[in-house]
Structures are given as structure tokens and as C-alpha cells.
Amino acid sequence: MSEAGDRAEIGAVIDEMYAMISGPAGPRDWSRQANCFHPEARQIRTWIDEGGNPACRIMGLEDYARDTGPFFAENDFFEIEIGRRIDLFGNIAHVWSAYEARASLEDAEPERRGINSIQLFKDPGKGWRIMAMIWDNEREGLALPDFD
């Protein structure tokens, strides 16, 4: 596959990942994870704890579904990509994906913004799949960079 083809396939994986978690309140179709993630993928949520220290929670796919399922069941949630950069080398890729999270697509301002740092592998049988994803949100002193 050409580099342009790889970039298009990577883009489709990222688009599916956002589509999978976004929507009105209700259960998510977690079987869609197979369209985006390697079965052994890790998702890492980061935050600043009450003491002002960086903290993280490392989750497998089932952990993520279990941890976020109750939130999605009760809340409208839309995560919209607002910037993307793909770095590609052979069978590995890195995507910087800036996002806005909203309870409604009509909200004037997002609830939060941040960046997903996503690493992918070109699986010979399934194509590009996310191996790891770590994210952080904007906060005082930390703003999204430009994605020109």
C-alpha cells in the first residue's frame, strides 16, 4: 500500500474510534473496538491529582469499556477531533489527535479539550490497529498547540 493509502486507512481508524465513543446517552457498541484497536491495546487516562501530581490509569479494552460504560449510559457525550498529525514509519505510526468533548453538538463551548497520543501497528491480517492511546486535557498553563 502507498503512503497515501496508509494515511487514509489510519485516518479511518481514528475516525471510527471517535465515532465509537460518541453519541447520545445509552450503551456503546463495544464490539466496534475490534475495528480500531489491537486486542492487547492499552488506553491510558491521565490527570492531575488532588496533590497537584500527575496520575494515570492504564486500561485494557475490557477495563475501558467497564469504566466508561456507566458514564456513557447516563450522559450524552461527543468527542470531536479538531486537529490531527500523522507520523508514519514502515509498519508503525503515531497520531497526535486534538479533540473537544461536548455533551451536545450544539454547545457553544466544549466541556474540555485535549490531545490523544495514539500509536498504531500495521497488522498483516487486520490492517492498522491502535496499540496504545494516552490522553491529557487542557488546563491552566497547558493549552493545545496549533495543528498547521
Model features per residue range: what roles?
Residues M1-P39, D148:
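Short, low-complexity N-terminal intrinsically disordered segments enriched in polar/charged residues
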Residues I21, F37, Y99-A101, I134-N137:
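Short beta-strand segments enriched in hydrophobic/aromatic residues
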Residues F37-T46, E50:
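Early exported N-terminus immediately downstream of N-terminal targeting peptides
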Residues R42-Q43, A55-E106:
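Surface-exposed, charged secondary-structure patches
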Residues G51-N53, A103-L105, N137-L142:
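A short local loop/turn or secondary-structure capping micro-motif enriched for an aromatic residue
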Residues Y64-R66, R112, P145:
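Non-catalytic cap/lid and distal C-terminal segments of serine-dependent acyl enzymes
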Residues H94, R113-L144:
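Short beta-strand edge/turn micro-motifs at domain boundaries
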Residues A108-P110:
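Short consensus segments that form the blades of beta-propeller domains
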